[in-house]
Amino acid sequence: MEFRPCIDIHNGKVKQIVGGSLKDSGDQAQENFVSEQDAAFYAALYQKNKLKGGHIILLNSYDSPYYEETQKQALAALPAGGLQVGGGITPENAGDYLNAGASHVIVTSYVFREGRIDYDRLERLVYVVGRERLVLDVSCKRVGEKYLVVTDRWQKLTEEIVNESLLEK
């Protein structure tokens, strides 16, 4: 078994939130834990302990007043460990994270429009960052007997069913 470390940043703080409680309105979330340390502290700790394959997730929406502070923390943490980074990733800002030391960028919301994958947007990201440095997050929620991809900080269900056909695309 491998341990994959994660750093979630919300409202400028590293924290663990209660799953599904994140709301864009008012930048709210129920919290399990809020750290006194910043993202760079945890990135250095993970590197010191040789933990690989981790990621940093910016939990505020791109248009949140907290996004810029969250982004600064993520960028400061990246040189310490070559982590993956996700949250508000677009073709316009993906290079900033990769140039700062991210091993990959993680994307979901940008490539989904009106409940479906927008393959033009996905191809644009592939063109900008390269297929080998792009992670398409297909986080999902069970609805009946199916698992549907969920986007926008786990707030919006899509029409995309997670199955073999989707994963092969």
Q: What label would you give each PLM region?
A:
Residues 51-69, 109-116:
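Glycine-rich, proline-tolerant flexible connector loops at the mouths of alpha/beta enzymes
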Residues 35-47, 64-72:
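Glycine-rich, positively charged N-terminal anion/phosphate-binding segment
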